[in-house]
Amino acid sequence: MPINVSRHDAIQGESRGPGVVRKLTVDKSTGAGGITAGVVYLEPGGTIRPHTHLIEEAMTLVEGRLKILVGNETDEVEAGTSWLAPANMVHGARNIGDGQAVLIIAYPSIEVGAFPVDVEF
């Protein structure tokens, strides 16, 4: 079986709100049977609106600074930080830095639905 390589610059990103682009790098379209992974690019001030999933989501910030929301708690994180949003728990992120933030995301399923939640953070 050949290696299925995803070149991030060749992937069409999808807008996830003003200043936020998500690129799925591994999912069912790349042959995955049980995982979805991707990269989210947030421009300064860009916000991933609060939402939930039926499954957990792992996140790792590789560049920039974010204010994150998980449940009813917030924190400010810098590159080199990872966190988990358990299944059905509201979470979101806002770029509070001066430059682009780059976030790696991963889910333990190829079926990932997002459900918006109307909360402020």
Segments (PLM) and residue ranges:
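Short beta-strand His + acidic residue motifs that chelate non-heme Fe in jelly-roll/DSBH
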Residues: 49-50, 68-69, 85, 91-97
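A generic "binding-loop/recognition-motif" signal
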Residues: 44, 54-55, 73, 89-90, ...
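A short hydrophobic beta-strand segment most commonly corresponding to one strand
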Residues: 40, 84, 99-114
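Conserved short histidine dyad/triad with adjacent acidic residue
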Residues: 38-53
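A short, N-terminal "cap"/entry segment at the start of jelly-roll beta-barrel domains
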Residues: 1-34, 114-121
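Glycine- and acidic-residue-biased ligand/ion/polar-headgroup-sensing regions
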Residues: 56-57, 61-66
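Short acidic-glycine-tyrosine-enriched beta hairpin
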Residues: 72-87
